[in-house]
Amino acid sequence: MQTPPVKDGPRINEDIRVPRVLLIDHNGEKQGEMPISAALEAAEEAGLDLVEIVPNANPPVCKILDYGKFKFQEQKKKNEARKRQKIVELKEIKLRPNIDIHDYDVKAKSMHRFFEEGDKVKVTLRFRGREMAHPELGMKLLLKVKADFDEIAKVEYEPRMEGRQMIMILAPR
């Protein structure tokens, strides 16, 4: 024997298999508890569908409405919620220990934009050759970045050496 396909979403009209329901009419007014047959008749008279809104209630709450319109509204709500969700990305800014003032300002402007967009920023400071002898210069630069963005960002990962580079991660406040 084959099982019927499982429908997602609320049960409508003849799919509602309970003896009594609490009915809400198409104007949103509570009609009270009644047999399912009377509720189906009322929906048919109005030319609309009987939709089970709260199936776990005792008795289940059913509403008379246009099911197509209802489904459309639900889909619209889901899409709006998805649009409002912001996926936080990790952006990377690469610096050098002996960076020029103007170059630093350009990188700072980019970081500022990333924080306004709600993204985290990974500041990577790469050392080459003899620069490895002076990690304090790198630490000084990362502490300057930390101080410059103290108002709009918090440090998520403190400055620390990893091989030939120093890394710090900042997140927007």
UniProtKB/Swiss-Prot annotation:
Signal peptide: none annotated. One of its GO terms (biological process) is ribosome disassembly. The keyword Chloroplast does not apply. The keyword DNA-binding does not apply. It holds the Pfam family IF3_C. Keywords: Cytoplasm, Initiation factor, Protein biosynthesis. GO terms for molecular function: ribosome binding; translation initiation factor activity. It comes from the Bacteria. Its main location: cytoplasm. GO terms for cellular component: cytosol; membrane. SUPFAM superfamilies: Translation initiation factor IF3, C-terminal domain, Translation initiation factor IF3, N-terminal domain. It is found in: Cytoplasm. PANTHER family: TRANSLATION INITIATION FACTOR IF-3, TRANSLATION INITIATION FACTOR IF-3, MITOCHONDRIAL. Monomer. NCBIfam families: infC. Belongs to the IF-3 family. IF-3 binds to the 30S ribosomal subunit and shifts the equilibrium between 70S ribosomes and their 50S and 30S subunits in favor of the free subunits, thus enhancing the availability of 30S subunits on which protein synthesis initiation begins. This is Translation initiation factor IF-3. It comes from Caulobacter sp. (strain K31).
